[in-house]
From Swiss-Prot:
The keyword Signal appears for this protein: no
Record organism: Pseudomonas syringae pv. tomato (strain ATCC BAA-871 / DC3000)
Biological processes per GO annotation: L-histidine catabolic process to glutamate and formamide; L-histidine catabolic process to glutamate and formate
Family per record: Belongs to the PAL/histidase family.
UniProtKB keywords: Cytoplasm, Histidine metabolism, Lyase
Post-translational modification (record): Contains an active site 4-methylidene-imidazol-5-one (MIO), which is formed autocatalytically by cyclization and dehydration of residues Ala-Ser-Gly.
Top-level taxonomic group: Bacteria
Source organism phylogeny: Bacteria, Pseudomonadati, Pseudomonadota, Gammaproteobacteria, Pseudomonadales
Protein's name in the database: Histidine ammonia-lyase
Length: 515
């Protein structure tokens, strides 16, 4: 099996796990390709060479591309065809993709090409691996793909560097392609028949975008469970809605697992829960009581999207595909990123709901009648405004996400003179997840601050061991609010803590797919 130890990855094509993909996204990796891949790679190249020797016509090998597929290319022009393809398709715009995402894209591309269905030589695959290992990351603009026929423009920018064109970043410095190749011990390559198309065709950029959204969504989910539990304690909420019997009766797996996690976080009892054991409150508002139902549904969406993205991360999404055993090349549509687009749309729903529910809990804490805490969680109200506008900020972020959650997979614009007449919009579907995640991080930061403030206002009362850990983590960076002060730095400090995933260890690792 594919193994990942610290920063070393021995890749058996088609066997990457979500945990490995998360690690690749987080840190540089030293990549080796398992020798078991060599034979199928070589066989696919030999198949392409046979087709050329037999003077057979095969799309992408000795024809033009897209609407120009019926144009036969002379043998002496095949190398120029591949170079022209890469140069002409490198038409992206926007800011450069970050190094961590470029690294993930490149590993995904190596994984796909090494499956042996692409007719690309080992020397080209090895060059990509050498760039990864040298931490040389091609300049890839953020925008320019509609997710079918694959991620052509961004992958063309990735491939430019192999030809000695374009530029790449190494340890924060931009280098021209020739110098960047030299850092990795390489010289510019001349691509053979089919190789340019193999490099450009594929869903690796769309998949990497969505994977980042998945990883951030998982981290936010874990944080939201903890923040929501802290809020239950801060407003003297009931533990009864988390009773396992309720959730078993419904049978929704995500809900059952979420409820179990809330029970672990809250513990069987605490100083807070004992303080109101005999109160006359009958039911809590939905934002407290229905957390397992809402967050359980979000968990189900995260898990389903993760399953799709893990499959796609190991998929062959090239076109045409080389089936060496049958001496055949078949044109299909594996480049269409509709599965990725729909997975990203589902992630957007989950991320939006995580933030929406958190914002409602913040609002609850502001209301003295609902929370039994001072208005806006501060003494001497009127002179002090406390969390009043922090809640408004959370509301603004939650509202932004409602618009951003609109599905992208229902959109399509025909391209390539209507030859490519239905596209997935998967890159846009994945990319907007990052903004949504940043918004939710801000919302959860406010809730974490508010819940800890509420608990501190209940002087002398302790919550569960796990929730006290979360409380201490925050208080190590942000002190109690005695009176109004400049608020934005505190939200930023809490957001930075959330970005560090410091709350992930408080939930079971088994809960989320990539942890």
């Amino acid at each position: 099996m594919t193994t990942l130890s610290a920063k070393t990855l021995n890749l058996i094509p088609g066997q990457l796990t979500l945990a490995q993909l998360r690690a690749i996204h987080q840190q540089p990796v030293s990549l080796t390709l398992d020798s078991s891949a060599n034979q199928q790679i070589d066989d696919s190249v030999a198949c392409v060479e046979r087709i050329l020797a037999e003077n057979r016509t095969a799309y992408g090998i000795n024809t033009g591309f897209g609407l120009l597929a019926s144009t036969r290319i002379a043998s002496e022009d095949l190398e120029n065809l591949q170079r022209s393809l890469v140069l002409s398709h490198a038409a992206g715009v926007g800011q450069p993709i970050s190094d961590d995402l470029v690294r993930l894209i490149m590993v995904l591309k190596v994984n796909s090409l090494s499956r042996g269905f692409s007719g690309i030589r080992r020397v080209v695959i090895d060059a990509l691996i050498a760039l990864i290992n040298a931490e040389v990351y091609p300049h890839i603009p953020l925008k320019g793909s509609v997710g079918a026929s694959g991620d052509l423009a961004p992958l063309a920018h990735m491939s430019l560097v192999l030809l000695g064109e374009g530029k790449a970043r190494h340890k924060g410095e931009w280098l021209n392609a020739v110098d960047a190749l030299a850092v990795a011990g390489l010289k510019p390559l001349t691509l053979a028949a089919k190789e340019g198309l193999a490099l450009l065709n594929g869903t690796q950029v769309s998949t990497a975008y969505a994977l980042r959204g998945l990883f951030e969504g998982e981290d936010l989910f874990a944080a939201a469970l903890t923040c929501g539990s802290l809020t239950v304690e801060a407003v003297l909420g009931s533990r009864s809605p988390f009773d396992a019997r309720i959730h078993a009766a419904r049978g929704q797996r995500g809900q059952i697992d979420a409820a179990a996690c809330y029970r672990e976080l809250l513990g069987e009892s605490s100083g807070v829960s004992e303080s109101h054991r005999n109160c006359d409150k009958v039911q809590d508002p939905y934002s407290l009581r229905c957390q397992p139902q809402v967050m359980g549904a979000c968990l189900t969406q995260l898990r389903q999207a993760a399953e799709v993205l893990e499959v796609e991360s190991n998929a062959v999404s090239d076109n045409p595909l080389v089936f060496a055993a049958e001496n055949d090349v078949i044109s299909g549509g594996n480049f269409h990123a509709e599965p990725v687009a729909m997975a990203a749309d589902n992630l957007a729903l989950a991320i939006a709901e995580i933030g929406s529910l958190s914002e409602r809990r913040i609002s609850l804490m502001m209301d003295k009648h609902m929370s039994q805490l001072p208005p806006f969680l501060v003494a001497n109200g009127g002179v002090n405004s406390g969390f009043m506008i922090a809640q408004v900020t959370a509301a603004a972020l939650a509202s932004e996400n409602k618009a951003l959650a609109h599905p992208h997979s229902v959109d399509s614009l025909p391209t390539s003179a209507n030859q490519e007449d239905h596209v997935s919009m998967a890159p846009a579907a994945g990319k907007r997840l990052w903004e949504m995640a940043e918004n939710v991080r801000g919302i959860l930061a406010v809730e974490w601050l508010a819940a800890c403030q509420g608990l501190d206002l209940r002087e002398g009362l302790k919550t569960s061991a796990k929730l006290e850990q979360a409380r201490s983590l925050l208080r190590s960076k942000v002190p109690f609010y005695e009176k109004d002060r400049f608020f934005a730095p505190d939200i930023e400090a809490a957001s930075q803590l959330l970005s560090s995933t410091c709350l992930n260890p408080l939930v079971p690792a088994r809960l989320l797919p990539s942890l």
